Amino acid sequence: MASPNGGDDFESSLLSFEKLDRASPDLWPEQLPGVADFAASCKNPITNSPPKWMAELESEDIEMLKKLGSLTTANLMEKVKGLQNLAYQLGLEESREMTRGKFLNILERPKK
């Protein structure tokens, strides 16, 4: 078994401080546009502060994310299908209400 100090030496020997810039698109073509910019923005992947997208989440939102993360693939697909069906039903209901508003002339601009 390795000693704790030996483990630190081993980990530090694995670190690479080499910078690979994309100065030459011929040598380093960017496979996915924007990935290099994103990687540059993530200078330290291990931070104590939450990411920007989590800053505005409430505890209910985080619980929902945890619940969705614990679902199996089949259950998650079923949840997505249910959300798509709900969105479709809401679209139909909105269409009916807009048609109703058109027939009642409540959506027309007042004539001057």
From Swiss-Prot:
Component of the DREAM complex. GO terms for cellular component: DRM complex. Keywords: Developmental protein. Expressed in the brain, liver and retina. Highly expressed in the retinal ganglion cell and inner nuclear layers at the parr stage. Expressed at a lower level in inner segments of some retinal photoreceptors. GO terms for biological process: regulation of DNA-templated transcription. Pfam families: LIN52 (PF10044). The gene is lin52. The keyword Acetylation does not apply. Belongs to the lin-52 family. The lineage of its organism: Eukaryota, Metazoa, Chordata, Craniata, Vertebrata. InterPro entries: DREAM_LIN52. It comes from Oncorhynchus mykiss (Rainbow trout). May be involved in retinal development. Signal peptide: none annotated. This is Protein lin-52 homolog.
